[in-house]
């Protein structure tokens, strides 16, 4: 198969800021640390070794193991859950909203890219372990962005009113939407496989978080992808000092404002 690669600039789909970053423009160097090239990960690994406490690591590993107690998981997932306890294990994390049926295709691209990066890093740095993580944005409140998906030029929407975190939404009223979608699929082999996936994710789950967790695990569990549900008391406890710092000093807000002003002065978007 012949492959043709198109540069980000040629697509005309990305901002000048994005393409300048990807081309490692010198004017942007002050605004980030290491560019994520394979070679730079060597230094990044050394930096991360000293920035994450073993206590936090053990809490994370224990919490994730608990989250998988009710989920059928693969040998690859079990292996990576155990590897998280080791100090020479590092995570590559992607995140996305709980889009219905995965929603836009970049939901899948993000996860595939994360898994592939872990494989490449393991080849280059065999003495370290790399675990792909999908962080569920279960606390997001924008239901409109996750409530629909497209299939064969049809926009299939979940007509539902909701307030609060989308991850906590009950799936009781989703069943008619699933029925309609399955009718559109037909009865061929791939359709039957997809219906089976729906049955083992959305049909048996009580909340959108649980369904998305199960769906992503079915699709990518064999590749060792770990799904993390952030709405967990143990993980929130680790977040307390950071939240306290932000509420009392506004550290990240102040830093972001300063960076934006510096960016305006030091980068020409035209």
Describe each PLM feature range:
Residues 1-113, 117-270:
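N-terminal targeting/trafficking signals and adjacent low-complexity tails
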């Amino acid at each position: 198969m012949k492959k043709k690669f198109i540069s980000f600039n040629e697509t005309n789909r990305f901002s000048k800021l994005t393409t300048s970053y990807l081309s490692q423009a010198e004017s942007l160097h002050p605004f980030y640390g290491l560019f994520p090239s394979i070679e730079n990960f060597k230094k990044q690994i050394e930096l991360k070794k000293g920035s994450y406490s073993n206590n936090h690591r053990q809490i994370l590993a224990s919490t994730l193991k608990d989250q998988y107690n009710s989920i059928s998981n693969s040998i690859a997932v079990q292996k990576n859950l155990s590897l998280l306890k080791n100090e020479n294990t590092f995570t590559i994390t992607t995140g996305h909203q709980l889009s219905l049926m995965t929603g836009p295709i970049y939901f899948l691209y993000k996860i595939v890219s994360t898994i592939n990066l872990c494989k490449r890093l393991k080849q280059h740095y065999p003495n370290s372990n790399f675990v792909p993580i999908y962080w569920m944005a279960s606390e997001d409140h924008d239901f409109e962005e996750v409530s629909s998906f497209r299939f064969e030029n049809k926009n299939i929407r979940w007509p539902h009113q909701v307030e609060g975190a989308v991850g906590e939404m009950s799936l009781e009223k989703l069943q008619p939407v699933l029925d309609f979608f399955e009718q559109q699929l037909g009865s061929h082999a791939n359709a039957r496989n997809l219906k089976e996936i729906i049955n083992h994710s959305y049909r048996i789950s009580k909340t959108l978080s649980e369904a998305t967790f199960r769906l992503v695990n079915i699709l990518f569990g064999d590749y060792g992808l770990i799904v993390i549900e952030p709405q967990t008391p143990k993980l929130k406890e680790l977040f307390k000092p950071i939240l306290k710092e932000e509420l009392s000093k506004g550290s990240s807000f102040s830093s972001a404002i300063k960076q934006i002003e510096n960016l305006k002065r030091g980068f020409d978007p035209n």
